[in-house]
Amino acid sequence: MADVFAKNIAVSAEDAAKLTPRAEFRVFGRDIIESVKEHMWECKAVLYKARIMPEEVYVLSKNTNEANVKVRDGLLDIKTRVGVTPEGYEIFQPRGKFQFPVKKEELATILENLKVEINLDKSEYTFDEFCDMVRENSKLALVSVEKKRYGFSVNDVICEYAYVWMNGALVESLNEHSDL
């Protein structure tokens, strides 16, 4: 049986640029996972992975919700929303994964997608310098995120339910990813 998650792996900006945009439908709430677990087997779901993810740091912008920027495994990762399907699925395109220290030009692109202007006076920035920059900007916020994810598929469509802690507060998530 093919691993439907394998085709979505990217470890560099070049790899991310080659990925096909995918449509995502995601909900957050409380007490949604039990219902999913009760009904997923009726759909002949195939469980692939249960994973405890390393801590991630998300960057939120008051100026836009079109950019998804996070730091995971030492990489500054960005994808942008490029559309919405008629059914309401958001379409995201990976834009790159950048190793720290991040070059000024790469960081400028990320800040542009977050719709903020910050004077970049150095040629590169460490993770700590990046976080300090975000904290100092009133339009940006850092959110610490921890996830326990359960990946499965239904008819080769990637799905996942997860327990997500955002700055320590627990919320449940359910999502579906579909390549375009």
Regions from the PLM with identified roles:
Residues 153-166:
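Extended serine/threonine-enriched, polar tracts that run as long, contiguous segments within proteins
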Residues 20-22, 169-173:
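Short, solvent-exposed beta-strand edge segments and adjacent coil->beta transition regions
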Residues 79-81, 162, 177:
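Beta-strand residues in well-ordered beta-sheet regions across diverse protein folds
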Residues 166-168, 175-180:
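Mixed-charge, glycine-accented linear interaction segment located at domain edges/termini
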Residues 2-153:
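N-terminal strand-loop-strand beta-hairpin
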Residues 46, 155-157, 178-180:
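Generic structural signal for short, solvent-exposed loop/turn connectors between secondary structure elements
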Residues 98, 164-169:
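A short, sequence-level motif marking secondary-structure junctions
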Residues 148, 157, 170-172:
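A short pocket-lining beta-strand/turn micro-motif at the edge of beta-sheets
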